[in-house]
């Protein structure tokens, strides 16, 4: 029986009540419809609980599909299995209790998500779920071991299960690994392929977000993954590398140096004066002269740029030809700054003075709100008289 208009307007606190922090009234209604249609069966209890979602085991029909994913019958490629039941994982994102409160910083600066609502948690979660599906499809297309998305509706995501019906793939943290060195190389390859093939940085890669099954490492939880041109992509990449190195070094594996992995994967070159320092996630690596703040760092950056182009430069060469190095590096990088730090400061002062002058002229010619209203009323009156 359909609800009347008056009943639809009634809202109660119980409508927002949740079970397991994710199963509210709307979510339960979607699950009940899927079960009534025979698309989702044998939904079991919570497999694990994370900061952003709960994961449940179940079984789904191979005919299950959604408009957003558009992959009907792609769960299995074997002919004659259309409409059969396969094991799946149901990931339900939390809506009422936002234990993962900094989702916005992973979505902002993403060209794929220019407009999103931050005041409505349900709309934000919907964007987050869509982001995870898009990232998973990128990984699937790049051949990176990961689950395949099957169905998406609001905050409910159905994916293929990693493992067998009776055996779910354990997290890397809980797995018994015989070949630790090979497993480490697989993890490094995942970071490299995500960056170079899929154009993504995981941003939360650790032993908790990797599964290990039959000697293969699978990557999961890519909702927070960002594109490589994201403002924080470099920071997240360093964090992922350090997390993997830290885990395997505790296991006794001889890991590669974080700086070397960062240079190999990202293609960025760490300056010579930072080579002996293990970069952290908050490290800033300048790529042009305009990003260098003071004169001392400018000379070091110039010497580093010169040595990369013409070979190594000694300290004596730097002291004798410091100003020339600055000038040469500026010319090679196409920078607008002139020789030395003093001229740079003068240039900044001149630009600041120009901006102040332009703002003063703009304020002088600004029309007040009262004058705008008077002009608008006169325009409306003239329009009415013409009609």
UniProtKB/Swiss-Prot annotation:
CDD domains: RIO1_like. InterPro entries: Kinase-like_dom_sf, RIO-type_Ser/Thr_kinase, RIO_dom, RIO_kinase, RIO_kinase_CS. Residues 41-387 form the Protein kinase domain. Residues 312-321 have a biased composition (Low complexity). Residues 361-372 have a biased composition (Basic residues). Residues 309-372 are annotated as: Disordered. Keywords: ATP-binding, Cytoplasm, Hydrolase, Kinase, Magnesium, Metal-binding, Nucleotide-binding, Ribosome biogenesis, Serine/threonine-protein kinase, Transferase. It catalyses: L-seryl-[protein] + ATP = O-phospho-L-seryl-[protein] + ADP + H(+); L-threonyl-[protein] + ATP = O-phospho-L-threonyl-[protein] + ADP + H(+); ATP + H2O = ADP + phosphate + H(+). Signal peptide: none annotated. It comes from the Eukaryota. Belongs to the protein kinase superfamily. RIO-type Ser/Thr kinase family. This is Probable serine/threonine-protein kinase RIO1 homolog. It comes from Encephalitozoon cuniculi (strain GB-M1). The gene is RIO1.
